Amino acid sequence: ALWKDILKNAGKAALNEINQIVQ
C-alpha cells in the first residue's frame, strides 16, 4: 500500500507541475 501512496503523490506532483507549465 505504501508504494501506491508514493505513486499517487508522485502523480499529483507531476500533474501540478504540468498545470503550472500550461498556465
Curated annotation (Swiss-Prot):
GO BP term (any one): defense response to bacterium
Function of the protein: Antimicrobial peptide, active against the Gram-positive bacterium S.aureus, and the Gram-negative bacteria E.coli and P.aeruginosa. Has hemolytic activity (5% hemolysis at 128 ug/ml).
Residues with PTM Glutamine amide: Q23
Organism annotation: Phyllomedusa tarsius (Brownbelly leaf frog)
Keyword Secreted (UniProt): yes
Domain of life: Eukaryota
Tissue expression per record: Expressed by the skin glands.
Keyword check for Thylakoid: no
Main localization category: secreted
Key words of the record: Amidation, Amphibian defense peptide, Antibiotic, Antimicrobial, Cytolysis, Hemolysis, Secreted
Name used for this protein in its record: Dermaseptin-4
Compartments where found: Secreted
Cellular component aspect of the GO annotation: extracellular region
Family the entry assigns: Belongs to the frog skin active peptide (FSAP) family. Dermaseptin subfamily.
